[in-house]
Amino acid sequence: AVAATSGLEAGTIPSSAELRLAPDACPGRQRGGRGEGLVCLTGFLDRRGEPYRTAMSSPLHAFDACSRLSPHLAWGTLAMREVAQATWRRQRELKALSPSEVGRWRGALTSFSGRLHWRCHFMQKLEDEPRLEFENLHRAYDALRTGEPDRARLEAWQRGETGWPFVDACMRALAATGWMNFRMRAMLMAVASYHLWLDWRRPGEHLARLFTDYEPGIHWPQVQMQSGTTGINTIRIYNPIKQGYDQDPEGVFVRKWLPELDAVPDRFIHEPWKWENAATVLDKAYPSPILDHAQVAKAARQKIWSIRAAPEFRDEANRIQGRHGSRKSGMANTGRRRKPAPRDTRQLTLGLEPPGE
């Protein structure tokens, strides 16, 4: 222990207002520190994690059902090894339980363990090719989105005012909490890249500033994946309206983060412009859609695939696949059929198999 200096009064820690600091822009962030990290880990493995596999896709449930360990891993208050080993211990404990006691735990922890492996995989991508934080992984996309991004579109997306309720709710929740589940992170980035046709760098920087779990090795490969510029990953152009109906069917999440839509009936909450009284809300309390989402998605798809169809595209994609592709997936070069992954993939998964399995 450190002895107090005699003759000095400790006093009180000044508040942010007394220090003339700006108001906290992220009031709902997780508490940090080693103790909080251990509580979070134990709570997930012992109580919260059972519905993980099925609940992680929806922001309605993901804030509780996901591990919420990512900030602790990013800041070092928990180590990857201890999280992996604690997961394996819990998996061994399940073997002694009856099927009714196991419930959904086995599938949940298998899925979670897989994501720990993927975390290391993506970090290795950036370590291997650091330029992908700044440059398109596949050079054929260098001329895809040129010039400065449309400022009005970028700022509407940043503020959560695109006029697409589910997208805006996710952005506002992220800004207030510093966290969002993976699927919705992907949707936010895909909407910026495809629907708003923004170069991935500026939206990627904005999200990086918001995430309390920002990890460059995970963030930038994912940003490029969701923007379609890797050349080897599936093009996923999320329908922002369908995602709302799928992940928040009753509009509970949207209403929490977009209180200006309180008067909109449930059946119109994801498409308020279809409500007969839309004029009382749109462009007053809440903006009209910034663009026709179906039209801009179609245009984006055509632009992306026109580049992929070029004869010279495949050679570069094969180089990228050979360097960065997951060997465990068994994915062949882009022009060939896939084959099953070999059984012995221990080295390729960083040797992190649970002991005894």
Regions found by a protein language model. Give the residues of each.
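Glycine/tryptophan-enriched, flexible segments
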Residues: A1-A140, V252-E357
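Active-site-proximal binding-pocket segments
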Residues: R68-D266
